[in-house]
Every structure is written in structure tokens, then in C-alpha cells.
């Protein structure tokens, strides 16, 4: 299991991290594009690939919650 070092608040928020990371994993499995998984995870999910993957995995109804969780995990960049 890979730990995203960009996420300052991973410890204590593992369940939250796994939910956000699942978006990137699912997106990478759907599109099989080289580098997509790492790009989606970069900057603790604060990037355009993550937002694109939310839409691509049909999770737009949860977009606000997913962005909030990413902000909590990466506290300091938002």
C-alpha cells in the first residue's frame, strides 16, 4: 500500500484518505493512462486530474465532500 507523502494529515485520517484515493485508483483502472494515478494523487489530490477523475468516475454528486476531504488531508495547501 502506497502512502502519499504529499498529504500532511494522512495519519489519523486513513479512512478519509482511502475514499479519496479510490477515486484516483478507479480512474486509472478505467482509462489505463500512464501516469494518471500519480498525477491524480499529486499535491495531495489538489490538482486538475483529481477533479477530472471525480467527473470521469461519475462521482459528481460527492464532489464537494471529496474536495473537502482532500483539503483536510493536505491542510496547508488550500
Swiss-Prot record:
Keyword Secreted: yes
Record has Disulfide bond as a keyword: yes
Disulphides: 7-44, 24-40, 27-53
Gene Ontology biological process terms from the UniProt entry: circadian rhythm; neuropeptide signaling pathway
Stored Pfam families: Crust_neurohorm (PF01147)
Subcellular location per the Swiss-Prot or TrEMBL entry: Secreted
Main subcellular location: secreted
Gene Ontology MF terms: neuropeptide hormone activity
Tissue specificity field: Produced by the medulla terminalis X-organ in the eyestalks and transported to the sinus gland where it is stored and released.
Keyword line: Disulfide bond, Hormone, Neuropeptide, Secreted
Any one annotated GO CC term: extracellular region
Summary of the function given for this chain in its UniProt record: Represses the synthesis of methyl farnesoate, the precursor of insect juvenile hormone III in the mandibular organ.
Family named by the database record: Belongs to the arthropod CHH/MIH/GIH/VIH hormone family.
Protein name as it appears in the record: Mandibular organ-inhibiting hormone 1
Amino acid at each position: 500500500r502506497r502512502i502519499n507523502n504529499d498529504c500532511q494529515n494522512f495519519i489519523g485520517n486513513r479512512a478519509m484518505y482511502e475514499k479519496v484515493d479510490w477515486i484516483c485508483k478507479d480512474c486509472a483502472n478505467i482509462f489505463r493512462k500512464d501516469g494518471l494515478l500519480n498525477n491524480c494523487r499529486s499535491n495531495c489530490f489538489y490538482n486538475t486530474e483529481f477533479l477530472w477523475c471525480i467527473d470521469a468516475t461519475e462521482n459528481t454528486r460527492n464532489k464537494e465532500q471529496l474536495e473537502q476531504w482532500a483539503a483536510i488531508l493536505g491542510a496547508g495547501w488550500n
